[in-house]
Amino acid sequence: MDIEFVRSRFIKHFDGKTGNIYASPGRINLIGEHTDYNGGFVFPGAVDCGIMAEVRPNGTNTIMCYSIDLKDRVEFKVDDPQGPHASWARYIYGIVQEMKKLGVDVKGFNTAFAGDVPLGAGMSSSAALESCFAYALNDLFGDNKVSKWDMVLAGQATEHNYCGVNCGLMDQFASVFGKEGCLMRLDCRSREFEYFPFKPVGYKLVLLNSCVKHELAGSPYNDRRNSCENVVKHIAAKHPEGKYETLRDCTWEQLEEVKAEVGEEDYKRAHFVLGEKDRVLAVCDALNAGDYETVGKKMFETHYGLSQEYEVSCEELDFLNDIAKENGVTGSRIMGGGFGGCTINLVKEELYDQFIADAKAKYSAKYGKEPKVIDVVIGDGSRKIC
């Protein structure tokens, strides 16, 4: 993102005066899907694209926002009980309200912002927007007294309370805590986390966006969550001496004990989740050892599980995964909730050009459009630039 581009638009729309510039990144998740609501681990990293905002207090009670990308301007009062109707502005409004709850004495400000997170790629542009303004408000009005974790929770609460999205913590966590050259293992139960080195010399990390999103009848995500909870309930009934809250607490042996009772579908869902927990831990060990071949192997295993056990893949994503295998890609899997979106691929540099060319040609021939290619570089989290 170009600082001068954002600054020039800010100056144009707000009296020719400058403010402070802040940035927050989007994110990827290398491994650990559908584990958050099962009490498990996720493994995200911040990326080198995101949201950049220039912000300056204006001495009033009015917040004036300009979206550079949408060429749209919205104003609202700090204490407005309803907030703006524009969907993008509600993220800023929500962060203002949540930071006020944390004791930040937010006053009126002017802001212009832009983003270069690819839309529809599952890289969490909304979390980047929330995190950017949480960081800015903490700096400008809060004496930087609000902790990083409270900023993460403020972003999550914004989604819940003002945007109608019942999200987890991973997106905001990655945007706030990201560190260049590192991925993070987040324990979704305890909120403990650890940095792991991710400097794959000789490899590239790239997303292929299928450019599809299948709308399914019913509530496919809720159905899978219910399946997992049903398995836990049956295991808990067999082991009243233990404490079983999520699949995180269950063993492979206990899953086998209830296989007949829970039915094939629920068994497959739980089998994937237990396997994914093990795969995340295996990837941590592999990264510490600099073993990217094992990382890639676990990525392929996750794709198989998401496709065949959790059943959240689709024809297009499986097709891209098959192309990755055909081209000797080290690792490839669905990234995100499924039913469309991206594959995330770890590929050796010498194979990269051929892989991308083959994926574009074959996908275009079959589906009439090319997948979008998004090269990924692991970057820093939320920060003040100047």
Task: Show where each model-derived region lies.
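Gly/Ser-rich oxyanion-binding loop with an adjacent helix/lid
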Residues: M1-Y22, I28-G32, Y37, F41, ...
